Amino acid sequence: KVLAPTNCGSGYQVVVRLQRRKRLAFDARTTLEKDERDLYWRLTRRVIPTLYRFKGNDRAIPIIEDVAVPPETLPDFLTTLQNIFKSHQITASVFSHAGHGQLHIRPFMDISNKTEMHKLHSLADAVYDEVLRLGGTISGEHGAGLSRTAFVRKQYGPLYDVFREVKRIFDPQNLFNPDKVVSNSTVPVDANLRPVSSQVAVTTNVDPPLPAAPASGESPPVVQLQVHWNENEFAFATRSCNGCGRCRSQSPSERMCPVFRLGTVEESSPRAKANLMRAVLTGSIDPHMLETEQLKGIADLCVNCHQCRLECPANVDIPKLMLEAKSQYVATNGLRPQQWLLGRIDLLSALGSRFSRAGNWALSNRQTRWLLEKLTGIAQGRKLPPFAAGNFLRVAHRRRLTRPSRAPGNKVALFLDVYANYNDTMLAEAVVAVLQHNGVSVYVPPDQVQSGMALLSMGAADRARKLAQRNVATLAEAVRQGYHVVTTEPSAALCLTHEYQNLLDDEDDKLVARNTSEICNYLLRLHQSGRLELDLRPINTTLGYHQPCHVRAINQGRAAENLLRLIPGLKVKSLQKGCSGMAGSWGIAKKNYRNSLRAGWGLISALREPDIQIGTTECTSCKMQMEQGTTKPTVHPSKLLALSYGLVPEFESLLSKRGQELITT
């Protein structure tokens, strides 16, 4: 593939250059589509970071990565290069711009192993000797930099003294980039590698400390881990970041990182958070700093959207690292009262649904909302979902849905979470109706509790673990009876399939994870297997679909969008405007309210377009944000399917319903 950036010259020059190169290629493809173009650029940018996905202690070290030799000597040079690696007993990755003889070479080495590090200088020496013998250069594209300073004299000989004199004239105090390109002393080739050796012992509540490598004879400090990590997984996660900076992207084709995009300061970036935890483990930062407000402030800049975990070329699990960091603080200091209330929103919702008239009046009244903000920290201006009159678990009990069936066939265990249970019982009604219409037996486990995502996002790992244990015990039994777990809430699906495995370590949580789906994905799989009823009535309207971050995080693609396109007459417009900016309890809080709106303004503005009548999304939090800046309703895809099937007569008013000032539809 040949990618031609806009700085290649005039259009005519680009065409001429491409025509000359085309005869050297086996095939060529012209792409004019934005998505395809972005794909090709992403492929070129991700080669190097992908090398850091390999498990184990060996890392791809960029010491000799930029050599160039005359193209005609490339075959012989590659043979010699392989022999050099063999003699040093080193494996390396090699990729190149073969047309002009440039190679990117990254040996895989354990930089915590001093014996291996001793090989580094002799390896570079041998490679550079061969490069210079062939008339090449040690830095063909990226400049000499720190890693090649020790070898610049070898390439330039007497001219090196001229370089030093120029440096002395313009920078007599050696303030700018000291020891880069030219140096007054011999700089070891590994002088600027980041420390990775653990100087801190880590332990769990039940395990003995994992060994560290203290510099002195003193006992190393011990960090008691709050999150479940496999052996050496924590250390590996902290050093997996290679510092490439892709997480600082502002590209509209990527989502990471919504908080960094608000204010492009380094501490907001996922990279900074990986460096923070690595510094703790290597002893550069006192582990007790994890218990301070200073480090908690940085950890709180992670809103647990999981987009960096998905889009990081090296797959660094920043959300899990930040869950550990937040949990360290909470384990020592506890939750603030306002955080506790937001984390146990199920208790507030249960109270609100029991007294729904009074609760909904309080939510829609400016004076009571002012008081609510003072007591709970929930932003006064944030539209909140109204309470239902009663909860769906009681409805399910009356309809005998809380009794498991032994009958064969497709069977679903419906996990409600908070919103479908206390705020929008009609959503649960819609899901049950759609599933039963398609011949699926529905069971609503009566012992289920909230998923605990809000608690996880705050770092209350112990409290979330208790909820996880209860849910896993209930749902695992349902799975063993032949049920597949389905939920309407993407955050709940993420908890069941991913987050609970960060809290628990047993076979049941893995069993539940393997057998859990978000409702739209489950229905789409029914359609793909030819088992979804297609007796859908037309809905003649245009809607804007937003894909939630947590739907992306569970790798379910665009199931809801594809399902909605089955409905006759329904025009689906994909609103690809990044994160909604809500991030669950983060966007509800007063202190984050304005930043939440800034992060989601692109989505809100897109929904205001006159050709869009309604919005749709799977996520409750995203729905709240989508209705924040408009009176247009945002409707769950399951409700639209139920409406199209003609299953719930009350849904006829869905498309014309309008939100209120402080309450969502």
Feature roles, as predicted:
Residues 1-2, 58-69, 104-112, 145-149, ...:
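Glycine- and acidic
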Residues 233-261, 267, 294-316, 348-352, ...:
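Cysteine-centered iron-sulfur cluster-binding motifs in ferredoxin-type domains/subunits
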Residues 171, 178, 209, 319-665:
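Iron-sulfur cluster-binding electron-transfer modules in prokaryotic oxidoreductases
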Residues 3-7, 36-40, 50, 100-104, ...:
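Flexible loop/turn segments at secondary-structure boundaries
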Residues 1-58, 62, 91, 96, ...:
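Terminal amphipathic helices with adjacent charged low-complexity linkers/tails
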Residues 1-96, 101-140, 145-206, 218-251, ...:
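Noncatalytic alpha-helical scaffold of FAD-dependent oxidoreductases
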Residues 28-32, 55-56, 141-143, 176-182, ...:
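Short coil/turn segments at secondary-structure boundaries
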Residues 62, 111-116, 146-155, 222-229, ...:
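Short beta-alpha connecting loops at secondary-structure transitions
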